[in-house]
Design a protein with these regions (language model features):
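A conserved beta-strand-loop-helix scaffold within acyl/acetyltransferase catalytic domains
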Residues: 3-48, 52-65, 110-113, 118, ...
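Active-site/acyl-donor-binding loops of N-acyltransferases
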Residues: 18, 32, 47, 111, ...
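Catalytic phosphate/metal-binding cores of nucleic-acid and nucleotide-processing enzymes, i.e., regions
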Residues: 70
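A gly/proline- and charged-residue-enriched helix-loop-helix capping module
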Residues: 75-138
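Flexible, glycine- and charge-enriched loops at secondary-structure boundaries
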Residues: 81-85, 121, 125, 166, ...
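Aromatic (often tryptophan-rich) hydrophobic motifs at membrane interfaces
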Residues: 87-90, 94, 231-248, 254-269, ...
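Helix C-cap/helix->beta junction micro-motif
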Residues: 98-99, 183, 339
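A structural signal for short, well-ordered beta-strand segments and their strand-loop junctions
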Residues: 102-107, 188-190, 343-346
Length: 405
């Protein structure tokens, strides 16, 4: 076996044929990282004229002039092949050490164990414990806070149809989709010049839910890098005011009284009725001559065998009445089926399902689109790091502990 450097297109050719891969292991992400001060490299293992393993790695000075070497979503290698992993990582470590590195950080897009949609191990399913053992033998330790989610939730699409998937959804999920359609909500793809719409909604969502949103420049760069290859989609769910109001008001009187009026209990115990956000919000926007409301947005990667639900946001004022976030998911699930993708990845969940967790609702939302047959929790190997220079690594660890005490 030979440890070699690759040209970006050589790496892409290998990655395109690799079965389990992440869009993070692409020249496009390398270019994105390069804009933020990282230097990209491409390494591989060649034997008898064939590449057996490869990785895009980026490096950046991070501590006292020493660099961290990072393989996001990689490397692309059979982690259960002890000889191959030993050869690759020893050579990669030596390269990093001779090029001013002190730490190697990897986040393999490689599953640890087969789990069902409730997060329970599948009887007779795969278990890649040997992959973890091989990493430990090489000196890797797992990190408790990976850059990308260790756990995600997916809908398997193999041998599925629109009709079957829809019928197998949770009843509430189906009802939310039907209601959004009845309210006249439409989903379309955003053009690059419309990404400000996407950013406006994700920013308000991040403020409401207390997380840091990406800058508009990030979304624009991702569009520029991946859209020419058909590997990213920014979508918006919208409703036209006149259409949605007329549909809403055309419902039977009894149902309309429940759906268009919400009740609030005031201090003396009396109940007063107030207009729903559907009519109130619509009236407010009508006064501003706005006829089309952006309700919800989503960013999806369409790479390899899966569609990945990466980022999203919704206008809080219209979430409950329009259910646009449900229609976006259904729109993209149908797209994934039409284009022959094998998996629809709802992406991150906070660990294995736990009803006591404050984030359980996120998992439950995603689970609602699946059945026991099609839904499953994905558990990856997780993020791992390997000291390249023991002296600088230990010094960095010591200073980090002192900083947090």
């Amino acid at each position: 076996m030979n440890f070699i450097t690759l040209e970006p297109e050589q790496f892409r050719k290998f990655a395109d044929k690799y079965p389990d891969k992440s869009f993070y292991q692409t020249p496009e992400i390398a270019n994105l990282r390069a804009e933020n001060g990282w230097t990209p490299y491409y390494f591989g293992v060649e034997e008898n004229g064939k590449i057996k393993a490869a990785s895009m790695v980026v490096a950046k000075p991070a501590f006292l002039g020493k660099s961290i070497y990072y393989a996001p979503g990689g490397p692309l290698i059979d982690y259960e092949d002890e000889d191959l992993t030993t050869f690759f990582f020893k050579n990669l470590k030596n390269y990093a050490k001779s090029h001013n590195g002190y730490l190697l950080h990897i986040e393999p897009y490689y599953e640890k164990i087969a789990r069902d949609r409730d997060g329970e191990p599948v009887e007779g399913g795969f278990n890649h414990e040997k992959a973890l053992q091989n990493l430990r033998k090489l000196g890797f330790t797992e990190l408790s806070h990976p850059d990308e989610p260790k756990y995600s939730f997916a809908l398997e699409l193999k041998d599925q149809t629109e009709e079957k998937i829809f019928a197998d959804m949770k009843r509430n999920t189906r009802n939310h989709i039907r209601k959004a359609e009845k309210m006249g909500v439409k989903v379309r793809e955003l053009k690059r010049e419309e990404l400000g719409i996407f950013k406006q909604i994700t920013e308000s969502t991040s403020t409401r839910r207390n997380f840091t949103d990406k800058p508009l420049s990030y979304y624009e760069t991702m569009y520029d890098l991946f859209h020419p290859r058909g590997e990213v989609k920014f979508v918006v769910a919208e409703a036209q005011l006149e259409e949605s109001i007329s549909k809403h008001c055309a419902e039977p009187e009894e149902k309309a009284s429940k759906d268009t009026l919400s009740r609030s209990i005031i201090a003396d115990g009396a109940i007063t009725e107030r207009p729903s956000p559907v009519t109130t919000g619509a009236r407010e926007r009508s006064e501003k001559d706005v006829s089309l409301i952006p309700l919800s947005v989503g960013m999806f990667m369409t790479y390899g065998d899966e569609v990945i639900y990466l980022f999203s946001g919704s206008d809080e004022k219209y979430m409950k009445d329009y259910n646009a976030q449900y229609l976006i998911q259904w729109h993209m699930i149908k797209y994934a089926l039409e284009k022959g993708f094998k998996r629809y990845n709802f992406y991150g969940i906070q660990g294995l399902p736990d009803k006591s967790s404050k984030d359980y609702g996120i998992y439950d939302f995603k689970k609602g689109f699946t059945s026991t047959e099609t839904g499953r929790v994905i558990e990856l190997l997780g993020a791992h790091e390997l000291p390249v220079s023991s002296i600088f690594y230990n010094l960095h660890q010591l200073l980090s502990k002192l900083k947090h005490h």
